[in-house]
Every structure is written in structure tokens, then in C-alpha cells.
């Protein structure tokens, strides 16, 4: 039963917070959600085009909206991927995102916050595993290496799951590995989670990661 519900939504208000902070009337609520999605997509596309490494390194993106301002905070594990050798990197990103959606009366402000322990973030870890799978590294080797990286971030437990046509086998299957404790049913346990999709030469693989950060 522990895998039937999203661990982030299950803990909202306890030890997880919303990543979009704004208020809208019911008629314009869907428009606000679409706007958030466009902003996140624009940022990820820009980082993919301008990065030197094979991964984005973005942990998550927070969006705060006011009447005349949209504040975007990018939590990134490796800021150099975005701004290395580019003095106007953030300004270029802001202009690029501004073009992606129509916002005449609101200013767009983008800030970058560095994540202290990048490999303690499930999104960054999933990108690492995806990159290994694209390079035809064995899925078991990729999962074990990911767990080794997580141990450096002082986490209490991790579970990694890969589903699909693993290693090009004709029948799709699910493989998973767990290290330490991952108490999914304990609400006071802070658990970070992500679902990530990667396209390989054999087809689409789904990666899910649960990281037990701490107990409050």
C-alpha cells in the first residue's frame, strides 16, 4: 500500500510545501497551472541547450506570483552548468522565459539557489541514472552507483526503481533496490520522491526514486 500515493502530496503541510505559491479565481485557475508548466518547461529547455554536462542538475523550481511580479527560484545542484562563462546567463534565461508566455503587466524575476548536497535530491539522482542508461551502462551498476552517491549526502535510506524494457529484453519488467529505511507510511518521515522518464534505444524506461531525508 505504501506505493499507491505520491509521498510528496501525502506529506503536504507536515514536512513538504507547495512549489507553486499563488491564488487565483476558479475561472482562471487552469490558466495559472498552464503558465507554471510553461515556465518550468522553458527553463529546462534553456538549461538543456546551454549546458556542457549531460544532466540539467535542477532539483526543483518554485514559482511565487503576485499581482505585478512572478518570482521564480531555481534550486540547482551545479550552478556552473547554467552560468559558467556566461556573465549574462540569468538575464538571458529571464528573457527566454519571458518570450515563452504572455505577461504584459507582470515582471519576471529569476533567482538561483544552490543545493548543498546535490546527490541527496531525487531529481538530480534520476538524471544521473538516466544518463548512465543512455550510455548503455548496466542498470544494476547504475543503481548501485546512485546509492553510493546518496550515501555521501547523509541520507537515511533510498529506494530506486526502474521499469520498462530493461537491457533491451522483449518483456518489460520492474527492478528495484533499497538501502537503509524508507518508511513511506510514516507522515513525520520526510521523504523526497520523483518520477523520471528516459528514452533509450530500446524504448522508454521509467525511473522512480524515494529518499528518506530525516524524521521530524
From Swiss-Prot:
Q: Which UniProt keywords apply?
A: Chloroplast, Plastid, Ribonucleoprotein, Ribosomal protein, RNA-binding, rRNA-binding
State the disulfide connectivity: none
Places the protein is found: Plastid, Chloroplast
Q: Name one GO cellular component term.
A: chloroplast
* Pfam families attached to this UniProt entry: Ribosomal_S3_C
InterPro entries in alphabetical order: KH_dom-like_a/b, KH_dom_type_2, KH_sf_prok-type, Ribosomal_S3_C_sf, Ribosomal_uS3_bac-typ, Ribosomal_uS3_C, Ribosomal_uS3_CS
In the record, biological process GO terms are: translation
Q: Which domain of life is it from?
A: Eukaryota
Query: Which PROSITE patterns does the record match to this protein?
Result: KH_TYPE_2, RIBOSOMAL_S3
Cite the KH type-2 domain residue spans from the record.
43-116
Under NCBIfam families, the record lists: rpsC_bact
Q: Which HAMAP family match?
A: Ribosomal_uS3_B (MF_01309_B)
Give the record's family classification. Belongs to the universal ribosomal protein uS3 family.
Q: How does it assemble?
A: Part of the 30S ribosomal subunit.
What is the protein's given name? Small ribosomal subunit protein uS3c
> Which source organism?
Drimys granadensis
Higher taxonomy: Eukaryota, Viridiplantae, Streptophyta, Embryophyta, Tracheophyta
Record gene name: rps3
Amino acid at each position: 500500500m505504501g506505493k499507491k500515493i505520491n509521498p510528496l502530496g501525502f506529506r503536504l503541510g507536515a514536512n513538504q510545501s507547495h512549489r507553486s505559491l499563488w491564488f487565483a479565481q476558479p475561472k482562471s485557475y487552469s490558466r495559472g497551472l498552464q503558465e507554471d508548466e510553461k515556465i518550468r518547461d522553458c527553463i529546462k529547455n534553456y538549461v538543456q541547450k546551454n549546458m556542457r554536462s549531460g544532466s540539467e542538475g535542477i532539483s526543483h523550481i518554485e514559482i511565487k506570483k503576485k499581482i505585478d511580479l512572478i518570482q521564480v527560484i531555481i534550486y540547482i545542484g551545479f550552478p556552473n552548468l547554467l552560468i559558467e562563462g556566461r556573465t549574462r546567463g540569468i538575464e538571458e534565461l529571464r528573457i527566454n522565459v519571458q518570450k515563452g508566455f504572455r505577461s504584459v503587466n507582470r515582471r519576471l524575476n529569476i533567482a538561483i539557489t544552490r543545493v548543498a548536497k546535490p546527490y541527496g535530491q531525487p531529481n538530480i539522482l534520476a538524471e544521473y541514472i538516466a544518463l548512465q542508461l543512455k550510455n548503455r551502462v548496466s542498470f544494476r551498476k547504475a543503481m548501485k552507483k546512485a546509492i553510493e552517491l546518496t550515501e555521501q549526502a547523509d541520507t537515511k535510506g533510498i529506494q530506486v526503481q526502474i521499469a520498462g524494457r530493461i537491457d533491451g529484453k522483449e518483456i518489460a519488467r520492474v527492478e528495484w533496490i533499497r538501502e537503509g529505511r524508507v518508511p513511506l507510511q510514516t507522515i513525520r518521515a520526510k521523504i523526497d520522491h520523483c518520477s523520471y522518464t528516459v528514452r533509450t534505444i530500446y524504448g522508454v524506461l521509467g525511473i522512480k526514486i524515494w529518499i528518506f531525508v530525516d524524521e521530524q
